[in-house]
Amino acid sequence: MKRQLWSRRNFTATAAIAPFGFRTLLANAMPAASGIPVGIEMYSVRNSLAKDPMGTVREVAKAGYQGLEFYGPYYQWTADQAKEMKKLLDDLGIRCYSTHNDSGNFSAEKIGHAIEVNKILGGTYVVMASSHEGSTPDAWKSVADILNSASEKLEAAGLKAGYHNHQAEFRGDVGTRPMDILAKNTKPTVMLQLDVGTCIEAGSDPVAWIKANPGRIHSMHCKEWSPEKDKGYAVLFGEGVAPWKQLFDAAEHGGGIEYYLIEQEGSRFSEIETAQKCLAAFRATHGA
């Protein structure tokens, strides 16, 4: 029996409503002033997504996001579930740009399913969300080897590999940090997805990183961070210390940016309201 990730009633209702709101969604889904699309990392709405995947996707489309990036749990979807989600994305006029994956998904045993689901969803990048294997320079070189090996299989299927940083990858001296090791030891086709907030918290300069790796920052997690007590990542876009104007300039003039992704780990507002406010602030800052 086909396993369903969402109820048939919810899917049918969402799909039925979508065509009537299509023009409104397109009007809301405006690109950045540069023409670069703005999406959302679905971890930002993780609680809503777990309860109602289809309804949550419709809400982020209604908010004006042009696309999205699914994270970890997507890997458990069957091909049929992925096809249902792709139909909804098409109905709403938005894209799945990429997915976040556990490092284990890049193994020879698991990469096949990742390829199948990502091809159905219509994405481009299969991103390693983090790695627990890296602890020494040699260990990080091994992570690079895994990415290179997986990228060959992904590229044969019309997909690309990527790596997403957290704090650990940007700690240490410039030139010997884990991210430096990954950048030097992965193929140029492996995307270096920059998480701005964690880079800053780790004490590194995200603008300098972009400039040091031209053409490889194809997507960027626009996550804010504040050093103020009890704030951290619980701030909206623009309420922290990230130098967004300089980041946009570097990303769009040499960085190789193809799409922006807003990510927020929690705030004083609901998940959906947070997503709406962050997108509005992004547009006000970027000039869209």
In which residue ranges do the predicted regions lie?
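Active-site acidic/histidine proton-transfer and metal-coordination neighborhood
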Residues: A15-A16, G67, Y74, D91-M191, ...
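Acidic/histidine-rich catalytic cores of soluble enzymes
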Residues: G67, E155-V241
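Conserved, mostly hydrophobic/aromatic
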Residues: I40, V60, L68, L89, ...
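N-terminal secretory signal peptides and thylakoid transit peptides that target proteins
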Residues: M1-F20
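C-terminal helical cap(s) of enzyme catalytic domains, especially alpha/beta-barrels
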Residues: I272-G287
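Acidic (Asp/Glu)-rich catalytic clusters
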Residues: P31-A33, V57-K62, W77-C96, K110-G122, ...
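C-terminal segment of N-terminal export signals and the immediately downstream linker at the start
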Residues: L25-K51, E59
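Acidic-and-aromatic substrate-binding clefts and catalytic sites of carbohydrate-active enzymes
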Residues: V45-K51, Y71-Q81, D102-K110, E133-K141, ...
